[in-house]
Design a protein with these regions (language model features):
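Short beta-strand micro-motifs within the conserved protein kinase catalytic domain, predominantly
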Residues: 48-60
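ATP-binding glycine-rich loop module of kinase domains
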Residues: 1-31
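Catalytic-loop of the protein kinase fold
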Residues: 105-122
């Protein structure tokens, strides 16, 4: 799709809620939080939202800079030697992810759900961080305990909207402690997958 004024190619994302009643409202609120948060984050290594979330009949749409693949797709393709990401591409991609996380951490923010689905590649081959619905401010964490409580309704959300515990820091899952180290653990899982044909370290 092209924007009418700039003629830049963009990616249009569409989501159709599947829940009913109160949980449908929670599902829509989660989607709005994700897109709104992403819209407010301005950094070259974070996915740029170019058109805000809009309701269209029974679905919701928004547009971002042009995306060609998620890292989940790229890592799956890497199983095939013919499509394996080379060392230079991996170095560039992980450096860009590190810069995005550094930007968040400097602002006292933690992504808390860095997975292969929350990293995408644009048309230029740049890796972009996205999926910011669970972005957590350290200012909201109790200073005496350093703990953060899960939202109860998260478990009732559709699977695609829940945290992916395969990438979650055990300190976060077991002790519910939030900090930049949560994202570093998840980044390590991604790096392992990228260098081991998409296999996770505990498989």
């Amino acid at each position: 799709m092209e924007q009418a004024l700039t003629r830049n190619t963009v990616s249009v994302w569409m989501y159709t809620p599947i829940s009913r009643g109160v949980m449908r409202t929670k599902e829509i609120e989660h989607l709005k939080r994700d897109v709104t948060t992403l819209s407010r984050l301005r950094h070259p290594c974070i996915l740029e939202v170019v058109e805000p979330l809009e309701e269209c009949r029974s679905s919701y749409l928004f547009a971002t800079e042009h995306v060609v693949a998620s890292s989940h797709e790229l890592l799956q393709d890497s199983v095939d030697p013919a499509h394996q990401l080379d060392e230079v591409e991996l170095q560039k991609g992980f450096l860009q992810l590190a810069r995005a996380l550094d930007f968040l951490h400097d602002a006292k923010l933690v992504h808390t759900n860095l997975t292969s689905m929350s990293v995408v590649m644009n048309a230029k081959g740049d890796w972009k961080l996205c999926g910011c619905a669970y972005l957590t401010s350290l200012a909201g964490v109790q200073s005496d305990s350093g703990r953060w409580a899960y939202e109860e309704e998260e478990h009732a959300l559709p699977e695609v909207m829940r945290r992916d515990m395969d990438f979650a820091d055990p300190v976060y899952v077991i002790d519910r402690r939030v900090g930049p180290y949560n994202d570093m653990y998840s980044l390590g899982i991604l790096f392992y997958m990228a260098t081991h044909h998409s296999a996770k370290p505990y498989q």
